[in-house]
């Protein structure tokens, strides 16, 4: 019989191109905490879920979805494994794989359970991701933070939007760089809680980083006027669907940072941007992922 505080540890050994999809699957499955570890030519993605939240049949269905994702991406099927561990083992297993991570020229990301130094030549971004995607270790998150280093100009008092804010890491990063205000939305209420916790962890006032549950309609209600820039680090097909909706929320000549995009999906994103009145300024690539920086053309 499992202990009262048992957790499922779910392990997915997969092709690197499946990393973000695997994270997304685990998040939607309800995992509280995820991590990734490089293994030769593969990646080991872990997720943790209270035992009472899933039965064996649920886990088998999750494994099948991951296999279908691999077929879609035309890569080898992942190796899927699950086991029950106690609560203390879960906490240790997840956290031991995550250490302070320098990102770009300006940031260093510190897990909440590691005390940061009193003095640093980098901006210290503290994070406890909980259920949310965005620990700073994924290529797409790093590309977005590095893009923000180029786009955020403190003397311009920029107001930004973060669509699908996850752990809040990108909105927090923007405020640390000098953005006057960031509006973040995510359609997962647990993720919103995580982002608000991280906002507090970084001592950012709620007026400077507004975090609400929702998507584009809620973002439209939050902002008083079009924003200077928008950040969107989610799946490519979702970006294509949402582009017509969020384009009017950005000022003419405003910018967008878009990631969560596989390299082979970049043409579809470029086409969607052009169709919605955007010009691609730069495409940065890392591993199998890319990040678009785009500028909105003058409105009608």
Curated annotation (Swiss-Prot):
Q: What is its EC number?
A: 2.1.1.-
| List of residues binding S-adenosyl-L-methionine | 141, 164, 186, 233
Recorded GO cellular component terms are: cytoplasm
Question: InterPro entries from the xrefs?
Answer: Ribosomal_L11_MeTrfase_PrmA, Ribosomal_PrmA_MeTrfase, SAM-dependent_MTases_sf
* Primary subcellular site in the record, as a coarse category: cytoplasm
The record's catalysed reaction(s) read: L-lysyl-[protein] + 3 S-adenosyl-L-methionine = N(6),N(6),N(6)-trimethyl-L-lysyl-[protein] + 3 S-adenosyl-L-homocysteine + 3 H(+)
- Please give the Gene3D superfamilies that the UniProt record associates with this protein: Vaccinia Virus protein VP39
What does the UniProt entry say about where the protein is found? Cytoplasm
Q: Which family does it belong to?
A: Belongs to the methyltransferase superfamily. PrmA family.
- Matching NCBIfam families, A to Z? prmA
Record-given protein name: Ribosomal protein L11 methyltransferase
Q: What is the lineage of its organism?
A: Bacteria, Bacillati, Cyanobacteriota, Cyanophyceae, Synechococcales
Which gene produces this protein?
prmA
């Amino acid at each position: 019989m499992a202990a009262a505080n048992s957790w499922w540890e779910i392990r997915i050994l997969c092709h690197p191109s499946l990393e973000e999809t695997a994270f997304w699957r685990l998040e939607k499955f309800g995992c509280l905490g995820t991590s990734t570890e490089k293994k030769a030519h593969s990646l080991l993605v872990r997720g943790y879920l209270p035992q009472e939240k899933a039965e064996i049949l649920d886990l088998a269905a999750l494994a099948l979805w991951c296999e279908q994702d691999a077929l879609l991406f035309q890569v080898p099927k992942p190796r899927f494994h699950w086991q029950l561990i106690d609560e203390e083992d879960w906490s240790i297993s997840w956290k031991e794989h995550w250490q302070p991570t320098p990102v770009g020229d300006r940031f260093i990301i510190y897990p909440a359970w590691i005390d940061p130094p009193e003095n640093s030549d980098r901006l210290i971004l503290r994070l406890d991701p909980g259920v949310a995607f965005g620990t700073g270790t994924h290529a797409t998150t790093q590309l977005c933070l590095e893009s923000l280093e180029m786009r955020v100009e403190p003397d311009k008092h920029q107001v930004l939007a973060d669509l699908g804010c996850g752990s809040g890491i990108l909105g927090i990063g923007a405020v640390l760089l000098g953005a006057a205000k960031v509006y973040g939305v995510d359609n997962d209420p647990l993720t919103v809680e995580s982002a608000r916790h991280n906002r507090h962890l970084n001592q950012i006032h709620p007026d400077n980083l507004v975090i609400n549950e929702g998507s584009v309609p809620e973002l439209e209600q939050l902002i008083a006027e079009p924003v200077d820039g928008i950040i969107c680090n989610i799946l490519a097909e979702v970006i294509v669907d949402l582009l017509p909706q969020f384009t009017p929320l950005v000022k003419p000549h405003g910018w967008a940072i878009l990631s969560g995009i596989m390299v082979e999906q970049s043409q579809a994103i470029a086409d969607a941007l052009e169709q919605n009145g955007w010009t691609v300024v730069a495409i940065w690539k890392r591993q199998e992922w890319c990040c678009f920086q785009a500028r909105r053309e003058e409105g009608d």
